[in-house]
Amino acid sequence: MTKKPIVVGVTGGSGSGKTSVTKAICDHFSGHSILMIAQDVYYHDQTDISFEDRLKVNYDHPLAFDTDLLISHIAALRRYETIEKPIYDYEKYTRKQEVEIQEPREVIILEGILILEDKRLRDLMDIKVYVDTDDDIRFIRRLLRDMKERGRTMDSVIDQYLSVVKPMHNEFIEPTKKFADIIIPEGGENHVAIDLMTTKIESILQKHV
């Protein structure tokens, strides 16, 4: 390959609409080769601790992530090297033994709540996007998602949101908004902002030769 890949970081609070924005990017660049990397598959491997102890981990804290591994993988993809991406089991709160082989692509989208927290990771991104959505809407989306897709009970989701998710958002996630190049209010529903963002990505793609 002769072109340098472009890395787009998409962040925001849990339930903000990051996935919708990411899908909009993928749909727009359907003619290009695109790879989406989710930060939450880079939670630390916890096979060495009990399930009960895994439930006590604060998964909205920067230390919950194996950021060094994520950084090394994004850097490798930028060099057009293949990576072995972790596969995370959300019901067991740890990684699976299997890995997913990922080939480099022309556009790499990195999505996650804390991808702008570490400067080393920010420095690997060409465009940094923060999806800004009302707290109540984010909570409802998280509640529905965790119950449907991750086997959680309503009580456990509510308790985690009030005791961990909300305070961690205020302490760690919201402050990273200042590092964003683009702030998108209302997530995937903001078509004007998404159009502006995709235009910028196209401009960078043309220069990455």
From Swiss-Prot:
E.C. numbers: 2.7.1.48
Sites where the protein binds ATP: 12-19
A biological process from GO: UMP salvage
Reaction it catalyzes: uridine + ATP = UMP + ADP + H(+); cytidine + ATP = CMP + ADP + H(+)
Any one cellular-component term (Gene Ontology): cytoplasm
InterPro entries from the UniProt entry: P-loop_NTPase (IPR027417), PRK/URK (IPR006083), Uridine_kinase (IPR026008), Uridine_kinase-like (IPR000764)
Keyword annotations from UniProtKB, A to Z: ATP-binding, Cytoplasm, Kinase, Nucleotide-binding, Transferase
GO terms for MF: ATP binding; cytidine kinase activity; uridine kinase activity
Subcellular location, record wording: Cytoplasm
One matching Pfam family: PRK
Superkingdom of this protein's organism: Bacteria
CDD domains linked: UMPK
Pathway linked to the protein: Pyrimidine metabolism; CTP biosynthesis via salvage pathway; CTP from cytidine: step 1/3; Pyrimidine metabolism; UMP biosynthesis via salvage pathway; UMP from uridine: step 1/1
Stated family: Belongs to the uridine kinase family.
HAMAP family the UniProt entry points to: Uridine_kinase
Name of protein: Uridine kinase
Organism: Listeria welshimeri serovar 6b (strain ATCC 35897 / DSM 20650 / CCUG 15529 / CIP 8149 / NCTC 11857 / SLCC 5334 / V8)
Gene: udk
